[in-house]
Amino acid sequence: MCYHRGMSASPATVARAPRGGDLFGHPRGLTFLFATEMWERFSYYGMRALLVLYMVKYLLDPQRAGQVVGLGAFRSALEFVFGPLDVQPLASQIYGFYTGLVYLTPILGGFLADRVLGQRRTVILGASLMAAGHFMMAFEHLFLFALGVLILGNGAFKPNISTQVGSLYALDDRRRDSAFSIFYVGINLGAFLAPLVCGTLGEELGWHYGFAAAGVGMTIGLIIYLFAAPTLPRDAFARREATHAPLDRTGWQSIVALLLLFLPVSLFWGIYEQQGNTIVLWASEHTDRHALGFEIPVTWFQALNPFMIFAFTPFIVALWRRQRAREPSTVAKMAIGCFLAALAYLLLVTAAVVSGGTHASWLWLFVYFVVLTVGELYLSPTSLSLVTKVAPLHLLSMMMGVWLATSFIGGFLAGYLGTFWSSMTKPGFFLMLAIISALAGLAITLLIRPLRVVLQD
């Protein structure tokens, strides 16, 4: 049986968290999921902050690259498709493959939870794999194997922790959007701390210290989740009961609606993921990082986006509450997010032109992150909430995995676009990114009216 927005569901068919009292207006389970996700994102973004710099400045040096098991064959495969790759384009492609594949495997993770293990055990499996993968990153010859373990672990973890947040609330509970925004703060609190801790350790003490710190963070998240069980939804059996339920017309319409939004959202993530790719290189090679007599470490710029999400979320949520009947629909918010991302890259076009080939002020990057962050807040948490509201109940984890696969396409696109960094002018490169994001926003805008009835948005 499928349940959609505006319809209530009975306790027999929808898993609900045990009654343990609300905390600040939300179920206690949200607090534990918040903390677990915070530490998981600490580990992910700690490694992400270092990844491109580590490859460009250290690992892909010809004297070291030969020691990495499997790298020669992997590079040959990439060059067969894309042609010869120097160090920077190769690093961008590896970054793109990693950031893409960590969001493809959630489809399998959602299926595993829905049909085999249940969400709790799948989350535990994923967290354990990721902890192991981060510690493996400390050994450079295991680099590709470590990335593979991290990819598999993320696939098991990511869709199911997000789905459990939605399962804490009835489908018509107006707290759902704010719950995902709060959950998103947890994501970005961990992502903010990660570059400051892992990035500093990696840049100042050695790359492997930064990767080991990421492993410690994931281990802490796993421990928190193991203690959280009494507060979380008991949904594994409910999923099995609904496994063979046929889809009705409304269910198919909801799935088609989500798939129509898939491509433009994927384009957004391809532009967004330049933060950990070419934006790192812009900060390292083309930015004057001196402020008050102090040179800002390159990895610290990766802390700006999550810090701003942490700071801006309460104001965005308050704005939506004040608008009430005038609040943009979920799909309209997603379009606004894409247009703001385009504006962010137009700012970098201006910075590249004004600097005239010299080092641009770090303030340009700061303003870029402000605009991009607001755009992300309009798109990402609202789209996650949309999936949990309209996806058929018995396919919820799988559809969450499919939706997270927008970042799979985006990750590959980010890697491919990054290969043009060395060959294009910097104003031309950033203008290309702005145009792609604006086209994504236009495509979503054209879908607002057709999808309004289907999504009841």
Where are these regions (language model features)?
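Intracellular loop-helix junctions on the cytosolic face of multi-pass helical membrane proteins
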Residues: 1-32, 171-172, 198-297, 316, ...
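Hydrophobic core of transmembrane alpha-helices in multi-pass small-molecule transporters
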Residues: 38, 133, 141-157, 357-378
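A membrane-interface helix-boundary motif in multi-pass transporters
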Residues: 87, 200-216, 327-332, 360, ...
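Central cavity-lining transmembrane alpha-helices of secondary-active solute carriers
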Residues: 92-111, 303-316
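Glycine-rich segments within core transmembrane alpha-helices of 12-TM secondary carriers
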Residues: 102, 175-203, 210-221, 225, ...
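C-terminal ends and interior cores of transmembrane alpha-helices
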Residues: 127-144, 336-357
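Transmembrane alpha-helices of Major Facilitator/SLC transporters
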Residues: 227, 294-324, 337-345
